[in-house]
Amino acid sequence: MEFKMDHQNFNVADLDKSIAFYQEALGLHEVRRNEAADGSYKIVYMSNEVSNFQLELTWMRDHPQKYDLGECEFHLAFRVDDYPAAYEKH
């Protein structure tokens, strides 16, 4: 069974500022975007040509203030070649 790291999520208070930072600091660019129909969230995935790993930036309309360390959820995602076997293992 093979696990592959897929993406890392960070919640951000200012999506445009965060996108600009990762573009400038790491040379990442937007590869896809998902926005709620009601405008409650926006999710932007960023990457580069060096790796398939993606950075996921999540903006939540109802959380305009800066995030405190440890306050928000985050996740590290993996892709697996045999999901039923991975589920059984874990």
Regions found by a protein language model. Give the residues of each.
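Short, charged/polar surface micro-motifs in flexible loops or helix N-caps
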Residues: 50-53, 62-64, 83-84
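Core segments of cupin and vicinal oxygen chelate
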Residues: 2, 9-52
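Helix-adjacent hinge/juxtasegments
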Residues: 57, 66-69
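Conserved beta-strand termini and adjacent loop/short-helix elements that scaffold enzyme active sites
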Residues: 33, 58-60
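Short, flexible turn/loop "capping" segments at secondary-structure junctions
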Residues: 1-2, 68-70
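Vicinal oxygen chelate
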Residues: 13-16, 69-90
